[in-house]
Amino acid sequence: MVQNIIQEIDRIAQAQPDFPAFDELGTIHSYGDLYHYSNALAAWLDQQNLPANSPILIYGDHQFEMMASFIGCLKAGHAYIPVETDSALPRVKSILTTAAPQMVLAVDDFPADELDFTGTVVNHDQLVDLLHQEVDYQLDHFVDGDDL
């Protein structure tokens, strides 16, 4: 029985790195891709001086970068808040006010000006560059159990 999804994803990635993890409109992304991209993001997040366990808003749709960002945030010890691009601005504003994330990972264009968001916004191009970094990441402080 799976005890922790992060550890299970990493186990599959190491045992079968080419096994399909995500099909994005016919583009197949493997568990190896998910492992490497999420590790790269987690390593970068660890260097950002974010408060421990602080949530990170991830803005996008159904792209692979969303999944990699979810896992990367969890590996770095941060909860993630997924927000779809078709969400109404008042709803997004409410989420920002309630959860108070200091960072947004914008898989799609994030309307920071319209929302008066003053935290860090990592745009799509920056995020893709981060995800493609080669890192040696040690999974030692991920979100687990009741951490959320």
PLM feature spans:
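Carrier-protein-dependent adenylate-forming modules in NRPS/ANL systems
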Residues: 1-148
